[in-house]
Amino acid sequence: MSPVFKDRTTEWHTTTQYRVFLTRHFARWLRKTSLTPAALCAAIEEMVAGLIDAELGGHVLKKRVALPGRGKKGSVRTLVATRRGHRWFYLFGFEKNERANVTPTELLALQMLASSLLDLKDDELEAAIADGTLQEICHETTPSGCPTPKPTS
């Protein structure tokens, strides 16, 4: 977030632009749940505000996301790659009733994936979107810094 001075007064506001992506594996898993892209974008908004459930190392964060009609406690867990900048990548998701957590081997693989995704240059990122490796779900700037979900079709 970059502070912006507004109208020569003491009022400050922030303008944030960030993009949210799903890996192909995560998008496939998402279709099997009742979770929506809007809920995922709202979860990113919470993480930007500092509401992170766990930092797993290697730029991988864990975030609980509520399924419709259920609270966060019994819903899904998502693993997200970010350097807390303008790019956020959903890597992996699971329902709490399916498994307790990822294994150390899975976490290491996810950390390596996170590193490679976060190191993508802009043209490489656009190529990954074009070939379906990544799907973008949020890419907007709003005065509050909140992402507006992109329509999926």
Q: Residue ranges of each PLM-predicted region?
A:
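Short amphipathic alpha-helical patches
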Residues: 49-54, 63-71, 102, 114-118, ...
